[in-house]
């Protein structure tokens, strides 16, 4: 149940999360001062996150050098804030120090960013981030006993190293989220190191916050992509839909005021300005709790808590009750004779208010669906307001809205039918084949990740009463992962079109896609059919990963094969592994059977 609530939170209210390591003073203390003290106290973590996210290839030793420089800068400024260098923005100082590290810009190929200034420099460092972390070595894993001993011997270095490894593998995750994960990691380490069954404890307790990290990572990347690719207006619309559903009694003027804080937060968070991101997050929470009477009846107890517990409390609070006087439909947008005049007076504000009114009346709809409805309404008014009798035209708006939702509902129902009819593994193979045919240019790691995410979305949502909103929200996040966040992300013309043309309708765009016609498969099998006895040593999970990779690489090699033929070859691969691992000489068996499977593939 907790996982389900977290899923709902990710979709509906992710920007309320606060770091569990934020200071513990009650809310009536000066928030700006508290937040600044937190930043000063945590300069080490903040520096590690920023550096490791900007320059993912940098070694831990290089990161430690920057931490030392930034700590000295902090101490100097705490002693005398009137010094000229202390008036600079923290992120500016950080980037200056990164650029000043001898030989580093040339070593990691970011010297071109150091030649830029201000916003252009920040943006350059942002675009230097790499979503594909295949370039990094595997995440180091320690034996539980060794992990506990390392923590006991040098807590600071142990935690710093953890923050470094997680940050460089999650370059687009907001700093407060990473700080939350780090705090939970330390709590888990303390608890599990006291247990007899340490390995089991670590495995059990790690799952929830790994899920938390993955879920928020997807949403944050999606939100930042919306901001950077489609502009502030789309991000504003997303936030209107989210807040109006969560807090249906909030007035439109109050919502507009809150949106100013929420939207400004994204500039720092999306650019990777760790300090501004933390400040922005704290400001949003303070705003909500200072106006709670006009925002929600569900958060009073939450706002009386200290900051570490406050964010979690609000996350898990229920959506506020719908106001008794809230009609089922807002007539002024459909039945009024002067809709066109109101729209023309201030189109942005008019459309924002429509989205607010529609969202607070429809808690059962997904965020993407609410954006689709808003787009349909906007296009309808564009058409109607040029007619002789506009009211007669837009009075049928609800029919258009219902048609739009019906189309989206059918897509979700079709996906949940796949979930009902196929087992978990077969469902994954279905999506691995489809995704690889659509975007064979993506790496094998990315495609296997996307396939697993699709399965998780359907497994999480398809048995719920709120199936539609849950599936539509989570699948939209998977498509956001596919589209990526960086400006230099180009996959193929058809996929790029869906990613870049219309944020609200990209789901239906992807539904209409077929296998990529521009893709040229490799001329050789590149070792795909070369198997060895090490397959017999693979544990179930590792063997499953190898099967997933085999299927994706098979589709890349033979994209023209139908799904049934691909499934048949995957079954043959499974049979070969089972047969040879039971043989007296597994290596000899693989040597004999591998060419047969390759020949069958060629003949298919």
From Swiss-Prot:
Query: Pfam families given for it?
Result: Serum_albumin
- Domain of life, source organism: Eukaryota
Disulphide bridges: 77-86, 99-114, 113-124, 148-193, 192-201, 224-270, 269-277, 289-303, 302-313, 340-385, 384-393, 416-462, 461-470, 483-499, 498-509, 536-581, 580-589
In its keyword annotation, does this UniProt entry include Secreted? yes
One example of a Gene Ontology biological process annotation: protein stabilization
State where the protein is found: Secreted
Q: What is its main location?
A: secreted
Question: Gene3D superfamilies from the entry?
Answer: 1.10.246.10
Per UniProt, the keywords (alphabetical) are:
Disulfide bond, Glycoprotein, Protein transport, Repeat, Secreted, Signal, Transport
Under the heading PROSITE patterns, the entry gives:
ALBUMIN_1, ALBUMIN_2
Query: Which positions carry the signal peptide feature in this UniProt record?
Result: 1-21
Kindly list the GO CC terms recorded for this protein: cytoplasm; extracellular space
Residues the record marks as carrying a glycan: 109, 434
Q: How is it modified after translation?
A: N-glycosylated; more than 90% of the glycans are sialylated.
Q: Which residues form the Albumin domain?
A: 22-210, 211-403, 404-598
Q: Where do the segments described as Binding pocket for hydrophobic ligands lie?
A: 215-319
Function comment: Functions as a carrier for hydrophobic molecules in body fluids. Essential for the solubility and activity of lipidated Wnt family members, including WNT1, WNT2B, WNT3, WNT3A, WNT5A, WNT7A, WNT7B, WNT8, WNT9A, WNT9B, WNT10A and WNT10B. Binds vitamin E. May transport vitamin E in body fluids under conditions where the lipoprotein system is not sufficient. May be involved in the transport of vitamin E across the blood-brain barrier.
Q: Please state which protein family the record places this protein in.
A: Belongs to the ALB/AFP/VDB family.
**Quaternary organization:** Forms a 1:1 complex with Wnt family members; interacts with WNT3A and WNT5A. Interacts with WNT1, WNT2B, WNT3, WNT7A, WNT7B, WNT8, WNT9A, WNT9B, WNT10A and WNT10B.
Query: Know anything about its domains from the record?
Result: The second albumin domain forms a deep binding pocket that contains palmitoleic acid (in vitro). Palmitoleic acid is most likely not the physiological ligand. Instead, this pocket may accomodate the covalently bound lipid moiety of Wnt family members.
Q: What is this protein called?
A: Afamin
This protein's species is Bos taurus
Q: What does the organism's lineage look like at the top?
A: Eukaryota, Metazoa, Chordata, Craniata, Vertebrata
């Amino acid at each position: 149940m907790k996982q389900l609530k977290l899923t709902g939170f990710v979709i509906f209210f992710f920007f309320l999360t606060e770091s569990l390591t934020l200071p513990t003073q009650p809310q009536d203390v000066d928030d700006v001062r508290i937040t600044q003290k937190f930043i000063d106290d945590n300069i080490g973590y903040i520096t590690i996150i920023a550096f490791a996210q900007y320059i993912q290839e940098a070694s831990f030793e290089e990161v430690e050098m920057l931490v030392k420089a930034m700590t000295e800068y902090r101490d100097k400024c705490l002693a005398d804030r009137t010094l000229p260098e202390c008036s600079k923005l923290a992120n500016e100082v950080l980037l200056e120090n990164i650029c000043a590290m001898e030989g580093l810009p040339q070593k990691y190929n970011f010297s071109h960013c150091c030649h830029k200034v201000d916003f252009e420099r920040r943006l350059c460092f942002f675009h230097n981030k790499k979503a594909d972390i295949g370039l990094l070595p595997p995440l180091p894993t320690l034996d539980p006993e060794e992990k506990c001993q390392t923590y006991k011997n040098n807590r600071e270095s142990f935690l710093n190293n953890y923050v470094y490894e997680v940050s460089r593998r999650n370059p687009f995750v907001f700093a407060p989220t990473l700080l939350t994960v780090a705090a939970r990691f330390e709590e888990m380490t303390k608890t599990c190191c006291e247990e007899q069954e340490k390995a089991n404890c670590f495995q059990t307790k790690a799952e929830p916050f790994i899920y938390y990290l993955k879920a928020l990572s997807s949403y944050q990347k999606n939100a930042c992509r919306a901001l950077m690719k489609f502009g502030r207006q789309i991000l504003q619309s997303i936030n209107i839909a989210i807040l109006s559903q969560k807090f249906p009694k909030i007035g439109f003027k109050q919502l507009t005021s809150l949106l100013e804080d929420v939207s400004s937060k994204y500039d720092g968070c999306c650019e990777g300005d760790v300090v501004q991101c933390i400040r922005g997050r704290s400001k949003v929470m303070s705003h909500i709790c200072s106006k709670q009477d006009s925002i929600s009846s569900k958060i009073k107890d939450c706002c009386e808590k200290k900051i570490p517990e406050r964010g979690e409390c609000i996350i898990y609070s229920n959506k506020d009750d719908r106001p008794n006087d809230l009609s089922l439909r807002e007539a002024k947008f459909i039945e009024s004779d002067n809709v066109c005049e109101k729209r023309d007076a201030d189109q942005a504000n008019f459309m924002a208010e429509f989205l607010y009114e529609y969202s607070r009346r429809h808690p059962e709809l997904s965020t993407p669906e609410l954006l689709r409805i808003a787009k349909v309404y906007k296009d309808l008014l564009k058409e109607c307001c040029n007619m002789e009798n506009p009211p007669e035209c837009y009075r049928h708006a609800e029919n258009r809205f219902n048609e739009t939702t019906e189309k989206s509902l059918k897509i979700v129902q079709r996906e949940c039918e796949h979930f009902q009819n196929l087992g978990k593994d077969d469902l994954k193979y279905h999506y691995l084949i489809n995704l690889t045919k659509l975007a064979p240019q993506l790496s094998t790691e990315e495609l296997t990740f996307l396939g697993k995410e699709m399965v998780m979305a359907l497994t999480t949502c398809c048995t719920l009463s709120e199936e539609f909103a849950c599936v539509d929200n989570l699948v939209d996040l998977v498509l956001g992962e596919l589209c990526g966040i960086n400006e230099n992300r180009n996959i193929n013309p058809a996929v790029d079109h869906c990613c870049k043309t219309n944020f609200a309708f990209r789901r239906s765009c992807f539904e209409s896609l077929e296998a990529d016609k521009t893709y040229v498969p490799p001329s050789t099998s590149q070792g795909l059919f070369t198997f060895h006895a090490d397959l017999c040593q693979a544990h179930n999970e590792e063997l499953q990963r190898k099967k997933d990779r085999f299927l994706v690489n098979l589709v890349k090699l033979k994209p023209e094969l139908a799904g049934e033929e691909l499934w048949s070859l995957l079954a043959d691969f499974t049979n070969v592994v089972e047969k040879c691992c039971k043989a007296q000489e597994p290596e000899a068996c693989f040597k004999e059977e591998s060419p047969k499977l390759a020949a069958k593939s060629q003949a298919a």
